[in-house]
């Protein structure tokens, strides 16, 4: 008998929900502070930011009085633009959720029917798989509870995306107004708003998962194998919604962006976010539905799946069989500690230090990543000491492996630090402070073609170090604790999700703030401040995508291990034709998926370009600024195109595991999962980094800070036009195809895990008859 963990079960039952509630309370507090910035012209109201004005970045000595601070018309204009963006984003998400709701009901029925049929819808108890002396609940119960967990995961994912979007549209105009009083104040509003989303999502995801486990436990009793098999539905629900959010939102935002850039910047030579551009509102709406709602759902899905993979593998290990609830909840304890660590880290940006100069913005965001990683390392050590037995056995493909608690601590740390390494490598390749992006900018001297060649080369090269980081973390964690080690390494990478999301959400909020400043006709000085916030946000957004892709690789492998265990496969032999055909098809899927999403952006952008051109040609006085463009038509084009175009890629991802598993069996499906993981990660990293580099090369030329940048500019010069073309090509790569691919590799793996009993029983019908 293994000695139990130091932390009593009762304490675990209390601590996990308390940490989640603290996270939610902290996000509400941040929202309250942001709401103190009024969308009125009352200067006193907009400058009060908290109890201790001097400490939290709202100090009087930070105020830089600017013309227009007391201008009622500017404030009214900002409020009007904010309302238009908010309404556009809300209407798109409601339209998307109608379609997604239909899918959710249909797929919930599929889960119930497929899993219920494993034992012919029998209601009799069955012998447990790993301990045949005991009886476990019937497959029909697992089918019913998996369906409930799926719906819960889906609803939580949708809500987290929607609330994130609401917070972002609430904060964007407030950031613009605060920029009148200095860059420090604008930074605080944008970052606090990001923190609202980060903590709300991390804490609510943990709380819903924790409550679900405890409610299911009432029925399952000591059948933990069945309980945690049913919980996998939660991860599937979260990720399937994220797929539609990422793809639909990505198509929306890039159709508007490409359309606005091609006609506005290149043909008409007007600045970005100019109110004369008919696609400008759609472009700003897109930032919220793609980069906020889509990204929020995506990281929530990763987090839910990593937890589910760890719980499934743990349930068949010694602390699952011995019913040590604290050790079993080790993944939840890591996430709980992560919320507390991120809370402390956030205070460094909002309360302990003040941003006074533009050059301090990017280091402040990078410090968030470093501080959270360092403190989290200590946090993991504490959790591993109190939450785990000193030694225990882990199920390892038919054999038992003895693991010490310090080995599991190292597994989580390896994932955590690999995430930081991937983040900083991504920054090196996508920030215009370093030579790779400056080289891409320099290549614009000779036109768009050389810019594209340099950008593609940069993207391919940027894959090398992240892949080594992922490979080393897989090797170390698997050597120590088999597939459970890989699952907790993925959780380690995602443990600081609240800080990661805060930084990610900060970017689009700053971007929107700049757009609002331009549309409201505010001074050049204010636009410079919002551009500085946005440039820092662009780099950190690329870091966030690196995190998402790296964690997706680890999560996918952990889910793959859980699938292989649950489907009863002992070895996956690459030399057998069943597996090799799966590998080849799996490696092809990310290309097929990328082709679909890229073409969708292209065809939607085509419609947008035609509409923007039509308005410039037919509305008299539009170019002169005496007539208003028809923004609503452009918003409608983006909405209709993205809803229609998100369905084929969604079907490809959702149907592939079902078709392969049913017709070709679990061995071929395991090949498909391995193939899609291997090629998907590479394409996702290179696509995201190529697009990010082109974007920042353009911004490098536009900012004209260094002598080198000045020699390439100003806006409208030939090198600048070449950079805009590169940026436009990179838009769908970095914001649609790249980020969506990490959902493809995770979602196929978690879906295979949920349906594993069905495939093991009824799958492979073609090989049975031929």
UniProtKB/Swiss-Prot annotation:
It comes from Arabidopsis thaliana. Activated by K(+) and Mg(2+). Inhibited by Ca(2+), N,N'-dicyclohexylcarbodiimide (DCCD), N-ethylmaleimide (NEM) and aminomethylenediphosphonate (AMDP), and, to a lower extent, by fluoride (KF). One of its GO terms (molecular function) is diphosphate hydrolysis-driven proton transmembrane transporter activity. HAMAP family: PPase_energized_pump (MF_01129). This is Pyrophosphate-energized vacuolar membrane proton pump 1. Changing residue 573 to N: Increases H(+) translocation, normal PPi hydrolysis. It is an enzyme of class 7 (translocase). Its EC number is 7.1.3.1. Residues 37-88, 168-190, 253-290, 351-358, 430-451, 510-538, 607-635, 694-736 are cytoplasmic. Mg(2+) 3 binds at residues 287, 511. The gene is AVP1. Has few direct interactions with pyrophosphate. Interacts with the substrate via divalent metal cations, such as magnesium ions, that are bound to the pyrophosphate. Changing residue 305 to D: Abolishes H(+) translocation and strong reduction of PPi hydrolysis. Mg(2+) 1 binds at residues 257, 261. Monomer.
């Amino acid at each position: 008998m293994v000695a139990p963990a130091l932390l009593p079960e009762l304490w675990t039952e209390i601590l996990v929900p308390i940490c989640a509630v603290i996270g939610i309370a902290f996000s509400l507090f941040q929202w309250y502070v942001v709401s103190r910035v009024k969308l009125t012209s009352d200067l006193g109201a907009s400058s009060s930011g908290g109890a201790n004005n001097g400490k939290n970045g709202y100090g009087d000595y930070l105020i830089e009085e600017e013309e227009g601070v007391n201008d009622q018309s500017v404030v009214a204009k900002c409020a009007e633009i904010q309302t238009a963006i908010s309404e556009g984003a809300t209407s798109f998400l409601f339209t998307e959720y109608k379609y997604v709701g239909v899918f959710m009901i249909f797929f919930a029925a599929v889960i119930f029917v497929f899993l219920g049929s494993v034992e012919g819808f029998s209601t009799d108890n069955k012998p447990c798989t790993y301990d045949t002396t005991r009886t476990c609940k019937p497959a029909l119960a697992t089918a019913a509870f998996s369906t409930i967990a799926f719906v819960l995961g889906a609803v939580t994912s949708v809500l987290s995306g929607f609330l994130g979007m609401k917070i972002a549209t609430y904060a964007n105009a407030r950031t613009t107004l605060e920029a009148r009083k200095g860059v420090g104040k604008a930074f605080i509003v944008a970052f606090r708003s990001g923190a609202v989303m980060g903590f709300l999502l991390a804490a609510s995801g943990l709380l819903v998962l924790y409550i679900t486990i405890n409610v299911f436990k009432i029925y399952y009793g000591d059948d933990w194998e069945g309980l945690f098999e049913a919980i996998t539905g939660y991860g599937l629900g979260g990720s399937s919604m994220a797929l539609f959010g990422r793809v639909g939102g990505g198509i929306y935002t890039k159709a508007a962006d490409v359309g606005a850039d091609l006609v506005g910047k290149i043909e008409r030579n007007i600045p970005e976010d100019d109110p004369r551009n008919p696609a400008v509102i759609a472009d700003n709406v897109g930032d919220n539905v793609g980069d906020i709602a889509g990204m929020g759902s995506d990281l929530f899905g990763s987090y839910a799946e990593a937890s589910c993979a760890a719980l499934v593998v743990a349930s068949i290990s010694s602390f699952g069989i011995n019913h040590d609830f604290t050790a079993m909840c080790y993944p939840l304890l890591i996430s709980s500690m992560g919320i507390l660590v991120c809370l402390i880290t956030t205070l460094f940006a909002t309360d302990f230090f003040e941003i006074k100069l533009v050059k301090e913005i990017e280091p402040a965001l990078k410090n968030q990543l470093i501080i959270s990683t360092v403190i989290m390392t200590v946090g993991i050590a504490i959790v591993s000491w109190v939450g785990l037995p000193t030694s225990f056995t882990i199920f390892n493909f038919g054999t038992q492996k003895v693991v010490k608690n310090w080995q599991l601590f190292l597994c989580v740390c390896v994932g955590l630090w690999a995430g930081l390494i991937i983040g900083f490598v991504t920054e090196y390749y996508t920030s215009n402070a370093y030579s790779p992006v400056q080289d891409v900018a320099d290549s614009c001297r000779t036109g768009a073609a050389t810019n594209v060649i340099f950008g593609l080369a940069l993207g391919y090269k940027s894959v090398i170090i992240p892949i080594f980081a992922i490979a080393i973390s897989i090797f170390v964690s698997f050597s120590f604790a088999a597939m459970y080690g890989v699952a907790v390494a993925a959780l380690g990478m995602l443990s600081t999700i609240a800080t990661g999301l805060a930084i990610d959400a900060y970017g689009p909020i700053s971007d929107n703030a700049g757009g609002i400043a331009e549309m409201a006709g505010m001074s050049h000085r204010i636009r410079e401040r919002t551009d500085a916030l946005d440039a820092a946000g662009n780099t950190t957004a690329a870091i966030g995508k690196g995190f998402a892709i790296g964690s997706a690789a680890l999560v996918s492998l952990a889910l793959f291990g859980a699938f292989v265990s649950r489907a009863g496969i002992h070895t996956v032999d690459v030399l057998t034709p069943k597996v090799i055909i799966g590998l080849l098809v799996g490696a092809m899927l990310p290309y097929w998926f990328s082709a679909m999403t890229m073409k969708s952006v292209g065809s939607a952008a085509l419609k947008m370009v035609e509409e923007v051109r039509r308005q410039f040609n037919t509305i008299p006085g539009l170019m002169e600024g005496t007539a208003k463009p028809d923004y609503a038509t452009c918003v409608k084009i983006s909405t209709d195109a993205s809803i229609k175009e998100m369905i084929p890629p969604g079907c490809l991802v959702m149907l592939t595991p079902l078709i392969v598993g049913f017709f070709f069996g679990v061995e071929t499906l395991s090949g498909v999962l391995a193939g899609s993981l291997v090629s998907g990660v590479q394409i996702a990293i290179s696509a995201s980094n190529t697009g990010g580099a082109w974007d920042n090369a353009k911004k490098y030329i536009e900012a004209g800070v260094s002598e080198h940048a000045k020699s390439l500019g100003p806006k409208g010069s030939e090198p600048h036009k070449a950079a805009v073309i590169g940026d436009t090509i990179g838009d769908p790569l970095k914001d649609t195809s790249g980020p969506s691919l990490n959902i493809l590799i995770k979602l196929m793996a978690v879906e295979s895990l949920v349906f594993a009993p069905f495939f093991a029983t009824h799958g492979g019908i073609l090989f049975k008859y031929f």
